[in-house]
Amino acid sequence: TSPAMRATALLTAEAMPGFRDWLLRQYPELAKAAGRAADKGGLNIEGVAWDPGNSTLLFGVRCPVGATGIPVLRVRLDPGAGWSVDALSEPDTLYITNHQAGQGIRDITHDPVAGGFLVLLGRSVSGDDVPFQLCRWDGVSTAVEVEAELPNRMKPEGVTVIRAEAPGRALVVGDAGSFA
């Protein structure tokens, strides 16, 4: 934990030892991809969100994406337990199926205003010519609703909700020094 975080005691940050190994044991279909470079179809998780309604962590997979759809790894976490893999249980996978070929999850965030999640979809590997889209997802179904098409030159990487009450706003940031 950094000195700044220790000083405030409002937030702590620490690694969860053994998490990667635990994750790959729970999702054996991803283990093969974990040994490859991201742009060669390797495992690339870019989005993470907390689902307060289900006490689950959602991990958005950028790559690999198969015929089943874009995987969202859902891992139940006991927030009152110690910070170790022993606090994790009941993993499962949801799939977003109404996406364009070559898309993966670039980010995912809980939307406390409208409920559900905002999901940023884009290239699963660098160089693919697929659209970047800001989507709304209910966290349960296999479908997302496209809220906005974003310019490829923006290279969107992150999204967050600004306000916790209506009207909410979303901020999207990109690699090219841009935001929307």
Regions found by a protein language model. Name each.
Residues 1-180:
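Sequence/structural signature of beta-propeller domains
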